[in-house]
């Protein structure tokens, strides 16, 4: 189980991402359409002035049951350990164990 503080930190990053997402997208579109280098430098300074935790790359997917940051399956939003337990307990319908 992950520490509660780490899970809260991820939630805070997600909120910041949502808050600045539209403005960041606007600045990036404006930068791609601008030809002047001076204007691009100004836009880059504005981008750098945004909070670091508002970038989408700082957000890490976590298991929603345990908070484990590694080995997550996107389809289920679960870590591999919990996914395996739930499959064996028949809690995920339609998922079968592979055999060949």
Swiss-Prot record:
Record's keyword annotation contains rRNA-binding: yes
Major localization class: plastid
Keywords: Chloroplast, Plastid, Ribonucleoprotein, Ribosomal protein, RNA-binding, rRNA-binding
Presence of keyword rRNA-binding: yes
Pfam families, per database record: Ribosomal_S14
Cellular location(s): Plastid, Chloroplast
Domain of life, per lineage: Eukaryota
PROSITE patterns according to UniProt: RIBOSOMAL_S14 (PS00527)
A GO molecular-function descriptor: rRNA binding
Gene Ontology BP terms: translation
Subunit structure: Part of the 30S ribosomal subunit.
Role this protein plays: Binds 16S rRNA, required for the assembly of 30S particles.
NCBIfam families from the UniProt entry: PRK08881.1
Name this polypeptide is given: Small ribosomal subunit protein uS14c
Gene encoding the protein: rps14
């Amino acid at each position: 189980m992950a520490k509660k503080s780490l899970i809260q930190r991820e939630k805070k990053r997600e909120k910041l991402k949502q808050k600045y997402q539209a403005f960041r997208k606007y600045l990036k579109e404006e930068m791609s359409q601008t030809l002047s280098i001076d204007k691009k430098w100004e836009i880059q300074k504005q981008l750098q002035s945004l909070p670091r935790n508002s970038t989408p790359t700082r957000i890490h997917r976590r298991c929603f049951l345990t908070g484990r940051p590694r080995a997550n399956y996107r389809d289920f939003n679960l870590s591999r350990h919990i996914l395996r337990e739930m499959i064996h307990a028949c809690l995920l319908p339609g998922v079968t164990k592979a055999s060949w």
